């Protein structure tokens, strides 16, 4: 999650938080700081509680690395934002029997479509 308020990741996270979701920021460069009132973790595996959705804003070429990080958690859904998809990442997840995968969709847009 970016600390820059103009960044898409920040805007989407802020929107979802206002809608009632708990947003846990992950950013190695901001580790230990606070964003949106929550502690920032360096890596997904550092989060000491269950994760429902990992919402990824990293470029597509980094999705396989994020998929491996995802597998180190008990997270339920791997979600990459609009414009982000990677077949290798999907294969990594499916081979590990992690089937709840959404790519190339925006969580904010989907929330608006389903609930507003």
Residue ranges and their predicted role:
Residues 1, 82-83, 105:
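Short secondary-structure boundary segments
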Residues 2-7, 13-34:
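NAD(P)-binding Rossmann-fold cofactor-contacting core
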Residues 14, 45, 64-72:
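Amphipathic, non-transmembrane alpha-helical secondary structure
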Residues 19-21, 73-78, 96-100:
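A short helix->loop->beta-strand "cap" motif at the edges of active sites that frequently abuts
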Residues 33-65:
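Glycine-rich, highly charged phosphate/nucleotide-binding loops
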Residues 49, 86-111:
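Short acidic, glycine/proline-enriched helix-loop-strand junctions
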Residues 70-93:
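ADP-ribose/adenylate-binding Rossmann-like module
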């Amino acid at each position: 999650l970016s600390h820059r308020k103009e960044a898409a990741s920040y805007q989407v996270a802020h929107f979802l938080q206002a809608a009632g979701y708990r947003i846990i920021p992950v950013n190695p460069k901001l580790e230990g700081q606070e964003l949106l009132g929550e502690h920032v973790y360096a890596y997904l595996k550092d989060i000491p509680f269950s994760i429902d959705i990992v919402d990824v804003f990293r470029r597509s070429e980094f999705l396989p690395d994020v998929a491996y990080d995802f597998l180190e958690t008990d997270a339920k859904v791997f979600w990459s934002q609009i414009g982000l998809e990677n077949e290798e990442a999907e294969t990594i997840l499916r081979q590990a029997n992690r089937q709840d995968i959404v790519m190339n969709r925006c969580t904010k847009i989907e929330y608006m479509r389903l609930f507003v």
